[in-house]
């Protein structure tokens, strides 16, 4: 039986028949070669079907696997290969593991695992080693002797790293660091550009961090998800003056030296303005969302220069944002390298160069503009924004009139004497309390329907009956049975995986 220990999007780490995946399986370890057939994880397949001279069918199916034959040929056609893989996901979901045969390029394996491949056969990789092609971290080098045993160690080490990256949520960073194979890079780009909706539906709502070292990070599913939210759904607080600021290396931005200078110079005037930070690869970060994912959890090389793709992204996002969120006045306190962003501001604005000597001028301009303006409770505005961002617009009317109580160094959202949510400052998110669970049940949001049992530390996939489509891995969820609240916790799988799998942790119960 398939037993997933961890998921990252379509990538899976676990065991089937005591064979760990993802892995490269060799003779005697999950795969056995006969004269006329091959046994893979207990299922027999004719050799001529697995290694055809000419591809007559795109996939083969066994009890546990969907097999893509002749991978060596398909890797040279990344668009076709990605299409086949995505068709398999659409048809089989998480019910079967995917194997690809005949891969000769070990450097394509991390990307293929990201796309959802769990097994590779070692036949052609072994042949490469026997011919003296040595695999190294920097590419292939030619030796004058058999290096297949060295290559086996290299591949084993690589697979352990991939397995660990799935488990700790850093697989996307790994595949971006391991860009040796141009075909692998092409496959990831195709997945990002052409299959965003598919990957977004299974991509975690948060990862431990984002190392945004390449332009490819612009197209990560989680970052596109965030940018779409800001462009299409975000609602600003009531302040009608916007202050545009640059990002900082330290996160959240408000703790950086540069932003602390601005905060100190403006003092109480900040209650009358809305601060908006411009950055890449995230685009726009309202101050009220700076503690959330991804804004607090990314790192980018700061060199004072922007790629053209980054400029286009930021300008489009600013234009869309400003089109939906109207301000009476926009003040841009930015360095020269961000001047291009003002082209996307559709109404009156004033630009002040971002430097310490201009802080007094900035204060004077804001003092002049806020005359008669309305002060905003910044903490309430922040928590309203985070609640809306995390759960959706529907939640705000249900918590309207709440108070904020601080206990055990945590802020709590309280209404009618009941603690509804607890704010986790380190993660920039709210945790659901049982007192608010009925809100989710009545609105059909973030629900995992389970069998009739009382959950303890974990709910396994076998105990899941159904799950709402809005659930992504790492989402806060409510556990329910026949309309009765049974608990709350954190999703460890996307909704579809919870429903289709029989093994593995679906929800970590709090």
From Swiss-Prot:
The keyword tRNA processing applies. One of its GO terms (molecular function) is lyase activity. Keywords: Lyase, tRNA processing. Residues 427-510 form the PUA domain. Gene3D superfamilies: PUA domain, Queuine tRNA-ribosyltransferase-like, Uracil-DNA glycosylase-like. The keyword Lyase applies. It catalyses: 7-cyano-7-carbaguanosine(15) in tRNA + L-lysine = 7-N-[(5S)-5-amino-5-carboxypentyl]formamidino-7-deazaguanosine(15) in tRNA. One of its GO terms (biological process) is tRNA modification. It is an enzyme of class 4 (lyase). Pathway: tRNA modification; archaeosine-tRNA biosynthesis. PROSITE patterns: PUA. Belongs to the archaeosine synthase type 1 family. Functions in the biosynthesis of archaeosine, a modified nucleoside present in the dihydrouridine loop (D-loop) of archaeal tRNAs. Catalyzes the addition of L-lysine to the cyano group of 7-cyano-7-deazaguanine (preQ0)-modified tRNAs at position 15, to generate q0kN15-tRNA, a q0N lysine adduct identified as 7-N-[(5S)-5-amino-5-carboxypentyl]formamidino-7-deazaguanosine. Forms a robust complex with the archaeosine synthase beta subunit RaSEA, likely an alpha(2)beta(2) heterotetrameric structure. Formation of this complex highly increases lysine transfer activity. This is Archaeosine synthase subunit alpha. It comes from Thermoplasma acidophilum (strain ATCC 25905 / DSM 1728 / JCM 9062 / NBRC 15155 / AMRC-C165).
């Amino acid at each position: 039986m398939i037993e997933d220990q961890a998921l990252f999007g379509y990538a899976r780490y676990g065991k089937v028949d005591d064979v760990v995946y993802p892995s490269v399986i060799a003779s005697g370890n999950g795969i056995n070669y006969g004269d006329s057939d091959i046994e893979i994880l207990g299922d027999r397949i004719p050799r001529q079907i697995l290694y055809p001279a000419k591809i007559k069918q795109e996939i083969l199916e066994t009890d546990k696997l969907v097999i893509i034959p002749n991978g060596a040929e398909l890797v040279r056609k990344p668009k076709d290969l990605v299409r086949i893989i995505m068709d398999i996901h659409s048809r089989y979901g998480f019910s079967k593991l995917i194997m690809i045969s005949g891969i000769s390029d070990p450097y394509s394996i991390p990307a293929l695992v990201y796309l959802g491949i769990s097994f590779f056969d070692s036949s052609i990789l072994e042949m490469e080693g026997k011919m003296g092609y040595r695999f190294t971290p920097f590419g292939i080098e030619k030796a004058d002797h058999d290096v297949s045993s060295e290559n086996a160690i290299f591949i084993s080490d690589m697979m352990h790293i991939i397995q660990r990256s799935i488990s700790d949520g850093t697989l996307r960073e790994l595949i971006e660091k391991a860009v040796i194979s141009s075909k692998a890079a092409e496959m990831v780009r195709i997945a990002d550009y052409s299959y965003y909706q598919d990957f977004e539906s299974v991509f975690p709502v948060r990862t431990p961090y984002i190392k945004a070292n390449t332009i490819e990070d612009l197209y990560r599913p989680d970052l596109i998800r965030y940018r779409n939210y800001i462009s299409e759904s975000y609602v600003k607080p009531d302040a009608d003056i916007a202050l545009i600021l640059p990002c900082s290396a330290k996160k959240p931005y408000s703790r950086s030296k540069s932003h602390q200078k601005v905060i100190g110079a403006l003092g109480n005037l900040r209650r009358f303005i809305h601060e908006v930070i411009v950055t890449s690869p995230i685009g726009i970060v309202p101050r009220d969302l700076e503690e959330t994912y991804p804004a607090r959890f990314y790192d980018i090389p700061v060199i004072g220069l922007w790629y053209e793709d980054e400029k286009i992204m930021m300008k489009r996002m600013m234009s869309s944002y400003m089109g939906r969120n109207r301000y009476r006045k926009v003040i841009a306190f930015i360095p020269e390298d961000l001047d291009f962003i003002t082209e996307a501001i559709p109404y009156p604005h004033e630009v002040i160069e971002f430097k310490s000597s201009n802080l007094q001028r900035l204060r004077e301009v804001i003092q002049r503009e806020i005359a008669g303006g309305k002060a905003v409770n910044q903490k309430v505005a922040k928590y309203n924004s985070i609640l809306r961002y995390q759960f959706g617009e529907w939640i705000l009317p249900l918590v309207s009139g709440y108070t904020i109580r601080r206990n055990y160094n945590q802020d709590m959202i309280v209404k009618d004497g009941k603690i509804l949510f607890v704010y986790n400052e380190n993660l920039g998110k709210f945790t659901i309390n049982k007192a608010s669970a009925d809100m989710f049940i009545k609105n059909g949001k973030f629900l995992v329907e389970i069998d009739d049992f009382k959950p303890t530390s974990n709910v396994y996939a076998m105990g899941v009956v159904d799950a709402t489509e809005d659930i992504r891995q790492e989402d806060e969820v409510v556990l329910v049975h026949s309309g009765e609240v049974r608990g709350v916790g954190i999703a460890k799988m996307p909704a579809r995986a919870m429903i289709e799998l029989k093994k593995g942790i679906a929800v970590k119960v709090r």
